[in-house]
């Protein structure tokens, strides 16, 4: 029996024509990067580098399927190459791929993300002075770890409700979600092997006060029960002692959303305001 898809409905959006955009994917070994760009703004042939936004998560088996997003299009319409990285720690290739990016193999997630960033630069699709990276929650841990490992690779880093003081959190079983997190990261309070491994990549614990970091935007929700606001705040406070942020050669911005939780605000227009603030930061630093 032949199977086919039937077209049911097409919702037309103002100021949007899908014919203006090119979608596709890059394959870097087993790593898959999905992308979208505007045809009249970008030629993806390596002859010229472009501003690039690279998103990553890579935890809990979550697969980042590309979906239409009005905030994405705001960057794409301004000439950005918009990319989503599928990393070990997701289930993009199934359970084995997930297990290759958790517990004592968590650093594989960070290696994958950096491999993708380096590939985009090597192919001259972008350059270190044009590359924006973003991750939220466990994706914030990803970004925080990567900018510690190789800060010169990125120009702007956006960390949304980031899980950046992971070791301290995992050592406190009285917090509501800690015990459940042992299934993803391990139990550092019980096993020294996990303690040492998590310590080696924890974004907060590995901040370098002398290195030049990218421009950094951090946000948190005052009512976040998953990554409690004091965790990103503690991370921000330590970063303020970095000599380049003190000398204002790099921008460091912390935004606490007083009416938001882990997934943002439930108010009708507040999400638009919140996302506009992030886009403004990116565009201002990535002129």
Residue ranges and their predicted role:
Residues 2, 30, 49-50, 154, ...:
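A structure-centric signal for secondary-structure junctions around beta-strands
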Residues 6-132, 136, 171-172, 259-260:
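Cap/lid segment of the alpha/beta-hydrolase catalytic domain
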Residues 1-5, 164:
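Structured, non-catalytic alpha/beta "coupling" segments that mediate domain-domain communication
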Residues 2, 29-35, 226-234:
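Conserved long hydrophobic alpha-helices within structured protein cores
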Residues 87-287:
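Active-site-proximal cap/loop segments of hydrolase catalytic domains
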């Amino acid at each position: 029996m032949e199977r086919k898809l039937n077209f049911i409905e097409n919702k037309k959006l103002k100021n949007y024509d899908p014919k203006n955009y090119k979608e596709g994917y890059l394959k870097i070994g087993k790593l898959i990067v999905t992308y979208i760009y505007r045809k009249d703004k970008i030629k993806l042939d390596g002859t010229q580098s472009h501003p690039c936004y690279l998103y990553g998560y890579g935890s809990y088996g979550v697969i980042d399927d590309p979906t239409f997003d009005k905030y994405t299009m705001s960057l794409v319409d301004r000439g950005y190459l918009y990319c989503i990285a599928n990393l070990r720690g997701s289930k993009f290739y199934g359970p084995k791929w997930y297990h290759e990016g958790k517990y004592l193999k968590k650093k594989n997630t960070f290696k994958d993300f950096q491999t993708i960033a380096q590939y985009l630069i090597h192919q001259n699709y972008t350059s270190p002075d044009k590359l924006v990276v973003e991750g939220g929650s466990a994706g914030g841990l990803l970004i925080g770890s990567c900018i510690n490992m190789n800060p010169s690779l990125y120009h702007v880093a956006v960390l949304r409700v980031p899980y950046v003081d992971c070791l301290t959190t995992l050592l406190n079983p009285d917090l509501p979600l800690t015990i459940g997190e042992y299934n993803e990261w391990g139990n550092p309070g019980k096993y020294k092997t996990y303690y040492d491994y998590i310590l080696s990549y924890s974004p907060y614990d590995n901040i370098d006060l002398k290195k030049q970091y990218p421009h950094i935007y951090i946000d948190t929700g005052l009512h976040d029960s998953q990554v409690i606001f004091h965790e990103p705040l503690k991370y921000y406070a330590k970063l303020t002692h970095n000599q380049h942020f003190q000398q204002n050669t790099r921008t460091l911005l912390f935004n606490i959303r007083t009416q938001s939780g882990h997934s943002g605000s439930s108010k009708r227009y507040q999400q638009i305001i919140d996302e506009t603030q992030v886009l403004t930061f990116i565009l201002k630093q990535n002129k």
